[in-house]
C-alpha cells in the first residue's frame, strides 16, 4: 500500500543518491507561510546529509516563492530537530504527543 498526504498546493521535493530516491518531503505554501512536512529518508541513506539537502532545497524554493515564515514539526531531541536547527530554524514551542496501542 502506498500512502501519501494530498495537501492542496504541496510541492514535493526528492533527493537522489546511489542510483535512486533516498529522501523526500513537502513544502506547503499558504498565505505567505510555508509548512515543511512529510520528511522521510531511507534507512540506508541516514547519516549522510540527505535530510539537510532536502531542507535546503525547500528553503531555496520558499525564497523563490517569497514566503515570509516557515514552519516544521519534529520530535524533540531527535536527528530531525538537530538538522532543522542547523538549517536556521528555531524552536517556537514544544507540545505533547500522545500514543496508544490498539488491542
Where are these regions (language model features)?
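A conserved beta-strand-loop-helix scaffold within acyl/acetyltransferase catalytic domains
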Residues: 1-44, 93
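Non-catalytic surface loops within mature trypsin-like serine protease
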Residues: 17, 43, 76, 102-103
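Conserved acetyl-CoA-binding loop-helix of GNAT-fold acetyltransferases
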Residues: 38-41, 47-64, 82, 86
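Residues that form or flank phosphate/diphosphate-binding pockets in enzymes
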Residues: 49, 79, 93
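Conserved GNAT acetyl-CoA-binding A-motif
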Residues: 62-74
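Conserved beta-strand-loop-alpha-helix junction that forms the acyl-donor binding cleft
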Residues: 71-81, 99-102
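Conserved acetyl-CoA-binding loop of GNAT-fold acetyltransferases
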Residues: 85-94
